[in-house]
């Protein structure tokens, strides 16, 4: 598994959208957000397929309405799993790896290593 590390914040990046602080992260809220298969896939792909920059929801190539994706990304942000920044009309996201590891050691590695059950 590749090394999972925090994405550096570029100079001049906009402030993050509202999110819970590290000490406000609750395990049941984080696990609730990750219990949706699409959200789990979003987080896993952000962890494993990312480069050193934030990604828009279009990067994933999901065949879903934009309103549906917006809902899922908002749920992940409000649970404290991802951080989003507004760049013009785009919202770009990355996983809050450092914050999640500080609060729930080992959780990020579990999500990264997860494989769906065979159907």
Where are these regions (language model features)?
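Short amphipathic alpha-helical "recognition" segments used for binding
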Residues: 7, 68-70, 94
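N-terminal helix-turn-helix DNA-binding core of bacterial DNA-binding proteins
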Residues: 29-65, 87-99
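Amphipathic alpha-helical interaction segments
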Residues: 53, 67, 80-83, 107
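Short linear functional motifs in flexible/disordered or boundary regions
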Residues: 54-55, 72, 112
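Canonical helix-turn-helix DNA-binding module
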Residues: 58-81
